[in-house]
A protein has these predicted regions:
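Extended glycan-interaction surfaces of carbohydrate-active proteins
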Residues: 1-2, 18-41, 83-114, 154-241
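Aromatic-rich carbohydrate-recognition surfaces in CAZymes
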Residues: 2-103, 115-123, 239-261, 267-278
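Conserved hydrophobic/aromatic pocket- or pore-lining residues that grip, position, or stack substrates
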Residues: 11, 149, 187
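Surface-exposed helix-capping loop/turn segments at secondary-structure junctions
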Residues: 87-88, 131-140, 160-166, 260-261
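Active-site neighborhood of glycoside hydrolase catalytic domains
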Residues: 116-159
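Extended, well-ordered alpha-helical segments in internal regulatory regions
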Residues: 128-130, 187, 192-195, 249-257
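Acidic/polar-rich alpha-helix caps and helix-coil junctions
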Residues: 139-140, 144, 169-172, 262-268, ...
Length: 278
């Protein structure tokens, strides 16, 4: 079907505003049931925050019946990721290409590193599954997924936060990657970080040595010696500006501004960055 798995969650977030929801109904069903009643194979490879997105779609259209019909599919997907991508630390690993973010500074196509992406997605999915379970009257399952979310949150804050750089980073085999990348903002996409402890990270969006560039926000900090040094491919995430990354970062920024008491950013900053990009 020429589907793109890496942005599946983003597609749901965007399409939930369509007046005619039959297209998104079918799109979700194709991904989860379009392979002879089973999920499409790419869904088992590329990172996804489908459960979170489907819950947020429900908050727009109010179709609880459709959402709860998808609950078994979403639970199966979550358990599969737990069985295939969880490290001994409890964090989840992913290759950068399977995040849709290949040739990054911090990762690699076959590197099993704990990235802010997959761990934030799994947190968001666990929180969503907990809320869905409550709506389905399954209190024990709701408590289980809430516990899973809390565990991931603590691991992200304690293992992926760089005190040195004031940023969420990728954790390699035995240390942080020592580079700020736009994926370090994804925890706020799901309101994961505690308030007032990690606000410092957002100073980098207004710093020209950080992510601020003439045409928007870069995918890696501009001061890093490996910024835009890959030089190998058409899709490079070592600093190039991408719509996918910009959408994630700006959503995370909106959450940070709307849901946290903070003094780092204001409305003018947000709209200036949006104007630069568009």
């Amino acid at each position: 079907y020429n589907l793109i798995a890496s942005a599946f969650g983003h597609h749901i977030y965007e399409s939930r505003w369509l007046r005619d929801q039959k297209y998104l109904d079918q799109y979700i069903h194709v991904w989860f049931r379009g392979n002879g009643g089973q999920p499409m194979k790419k869904l088992a490879t590329f990172s996804s925050w489908a459960a979170d997105a489907i819950l947020n779609r429900y908050k727009v259209n109010g179709n609880k019946e459709y959402m709860l019909d998808m609950l078994p599919d979403l639970e199966s997907e979550y358990k599969r990721w737990e069985s295939t991508h969880r490290l001994s630390s409890g964090l989840f690993w992913q290759g950068d290409v399977q995040d849709g973010m290949e040739e990054s500074i911090s990762g690699g196509r076959k590197k099993k590193y704990a990235r802010p992406t997959i761990n934030s997605y799994m947190f968001g999915n666990a929180k969503a599954l907990s809320q869905m379970a409550l709506l389905a009257g399954k209190k024990d399952e709701a408590a289980l997924y809430e516990h899973k979310a809390d565990t991931i949150k603590n691991l992200v804050e304690n293992k992926l936060w760089s005190v040195k750089h004031g940023f969420f980073e990728t954790y390699r085999t035995d240390s942080l990657a020592n580079v700020r990348e736009a994926i370090g903002y994804i925890p706020w996409y799901f309101n994961l970080p505690d308030a007032n402890k990690y606000d410092l990270a957002w100073k980098q969006v207004t710093d020209e040595g950080g992510f601020l560039a003439p045409y928007g926000l870069t995918t890696a900090e501009r001061r890093h010696p490996l910024f835009r040094m890959a030089g190998c491919c058409k899709c490079e995430w070592d600093g190039a500006i991408w719509p996918f990354a910009t959408a994630q970062t700006m959503t995370a920024m909106a959450n940070f501004m709307n849901n946290y008491k903070q003094t780092v950013l204001n409305d003018s900053t947000y709209f200036h960055l949006m104007e630069l990009y568009v």
